[in-house]
């Protein structure tokens, strides 16, 4: 049997905190239609992501990719920003 790797998830969001060393907090928003009420709902979630060069500041739009666990809460890495 072959060992097939699944593609890693990629999310886009906005940096809301860059106070910790080599870590940024990224807020990711998603919109979906409620199945019963048919209204669009906006839900946001915060992810701790690894920023090895400390180059992203609050307000930057970034993409994060899933990775191996880096610490207790960090399992995402910042791959690029705008």
Curated annotation (Swiss-Prot):
<protein>
    <recommendedName>
        <fullName>Small ribosomal subunit protein uS17</fullName>
    </recommendedName>
</protein>
<dbReference type="InterPro" id="IPR000266">
    <property type="entry name" value="Ribosomal_uS17"/>
</dbReference>
<dbReference type="InterPro" id="IPR012340">
    <property type="entry name" value="NA-bd_OB-fold"/>
</dbReference>
<dbReference type="GO" id="GO:0022627">
    <property type="term" value="C:cytosolic small ribosomal subunit"/>
</dbReference>
<keyword id="KW-0689">Ribosomal protein</keyword>
<keyword id="KW-0699">rRNA-binding</keyword>
<dbReference type="GO" id="GO:0003735">
    <property type="term" value="F:structural constituent of ribosome"/>
</dbReference>
<dbReference type="InterPro" id="IPR019984">
    <property type="entry name" value="Ribosomal_uS17_bact/chlr"/>
</dbReference>
<comment type="similarity">
    <text>Belongs to the universal ribosomal protein uS17 family.</text>
</comment>
<keyword id="KW-0694">RNA-binding</keyword>
<dbReference type="InterPro" id="IPR019979">
    <property type="entry name" value="Ribosomal_uS17_CS"/>
</dbReference>
<dbReference type="GO" id="GO:0006412">
    <property type="term" value="P:translation"/>
</dbReference>
<comment type="subunit">
    <text>Part of the 30S ribosomal subunit.</text>
</comment>
<dbReference type="Pfam" id="PF00366">
    <property type="entry name" value="Ribosomal_S17"/>
</dbReference>
<keyword id="KW-0687">Ribonucleoprotein</keyword>
<dbReference type="GO" id="GO:0019843">
    <property type="term" value="F:rRNA binding"/>
</dbReference>
<comment type="function">
    <text>One of the primary rRNA binding proteins, it binds specifically to the 5'-end of 16S ribosomal RNA.</text>
</comment>
């Amino acid at each position: 049997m072959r060992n097939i790797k699944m593609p890693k998830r990629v999310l886009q969001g906005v940096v809301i905190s860059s106070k910790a060393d080599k870590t940024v907090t990224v807020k990711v928003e998603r919109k979906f239609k409620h199945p019963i009420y048919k209204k669009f709902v906006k839900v946001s979630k915060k992810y701790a992501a690894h920023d090895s060069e400390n180059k992203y500041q609050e307000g930057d739009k970034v993409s994060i990719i899933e990775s191996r666990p880096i610490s207790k809460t960090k399992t995402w890495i910042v791959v690029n920003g705008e």
